[in-house]
């Protein structure tokens, strides 16, 4: 996928496409605590080890510098894969995305954990590569994750994120279709696909996806924001304003609310100059 370009391509997508794609990496799923695998000795974690892992992840998120030092010390004392994963999480929290992604790649390569856990490592590595502006490596790791766990709908979404950021909207839609085939009731995925359809100027298909997302989640602010974009394109500024005002009312202070405010201001400037 050497045709991937940097994040500058996202400047062409002023909507909510892929805004939510990085959330899960901040949540840093407790891979080992959830799966019960990953120990270097017997393939499982004791209750004490699980608690240590959870505490390490929490510190890595809340106080990443302290978390990094703690994770390194745990690793050096024989903490194994869970400690190595915690080191990477701390690096992500510190904004050192390339180093985190490199460590996650190495961890996935060395891991003796079950395929679902390794796929999770690769998915997180892919997200870190995206944040490091390396979409080619992100796509590579996400593809590897899908080879291990092809029936996980979130992994298809993850790869669609990289494809969308690269401006490969048709390929992104293909991956989103596969995710929806596995789980049709994903409002967020319908919204992502609607944004991709909008970028391809397939506005009717985009509106269908947005309306279906709102059937599932009537107050979804991302869906309302996207519908506002579609109304604006159709020249229905009053309806666009209504949706964006709802976004601001229901999620004030969030990035999507800030984007809605900016869109209203731009629309008012254009209207005033006509």
Regions found by a protein language model. Give the residues of each.
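Structural signature of tandem alpha-helical TPR/SEL1-like repeats
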Residues: 63-66, 95-102, 132-141, 166-178, ...
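Residue-level recognition of tetratricopeptide repeat
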Residues: 56-57, 89, 127, 161, ...
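Canonical tetratricopeptide repeat
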Residues: 86, 120, 124, 158, ...
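Helix-start (N-cap) detector for alpha-helical repeat units in TPR-like alpha-solenoids
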Residues: 49, 81-82, 115, 119, ...
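Structural marker of alpha-solenoid helical repeat scaffolds
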Residues: 76-77, 110-114, 148, 182, ...
């Amino acid at each position: 996928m050497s045709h991937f370009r940097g994040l500058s391509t996202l400047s062409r997508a002023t909507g909510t496409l892929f805004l939510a794609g990085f959330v899960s990496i901040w949540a840093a799923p407790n891979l080992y605590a959830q799966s019960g695998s990953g120990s270097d000795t017997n393939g499982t974690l004791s209750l004490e080890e699980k608690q240590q892992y959870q505490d390490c992840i929490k510190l890595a998120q809340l106080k990443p510098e302290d978390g990094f030092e703690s994770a390194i010390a745990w690793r050096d004392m024989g903490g194994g894969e869970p400690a190595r994963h915690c080191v990477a999480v701390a690096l992500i929290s510190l904004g050192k995305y390339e180093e985190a992604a490199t460590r996650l790649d190495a961890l996935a390569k060395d891991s003796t954990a079950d395929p679902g856990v390794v796929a999770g490592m690769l998915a997180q590595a892919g997200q870190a590569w995206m944040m490091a502006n390396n979409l080619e490596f992100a796509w590579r790791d996400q593809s590897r994750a899908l080879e291990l766990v092809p029936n996980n709908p979130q992994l298809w979404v993850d790869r669609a994120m990289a494809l969308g950021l690269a401006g490969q909207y048709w390929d992104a839609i293909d991956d989103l279709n596969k995710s929806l085939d596995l789980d049709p009731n994903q409002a967020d995925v319908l919204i992502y696909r609607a944004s991709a359809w909008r970028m391809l100027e397939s506005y009717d298909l985009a509106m269908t996806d947005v309306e279906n997302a709102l059937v599932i989640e009537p107050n979804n602010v991302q869906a309302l924001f996207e519908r506002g974009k579609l109304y604006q394109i159709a020249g229905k500024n009053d309806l666009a304003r209504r949706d964006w005002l709802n976004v601001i009312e229901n999620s004030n202070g969030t990035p999507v609310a800030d984007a809605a405010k900016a869109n209203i201001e731009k629309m008012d400037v254009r209207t005033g100059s006509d």
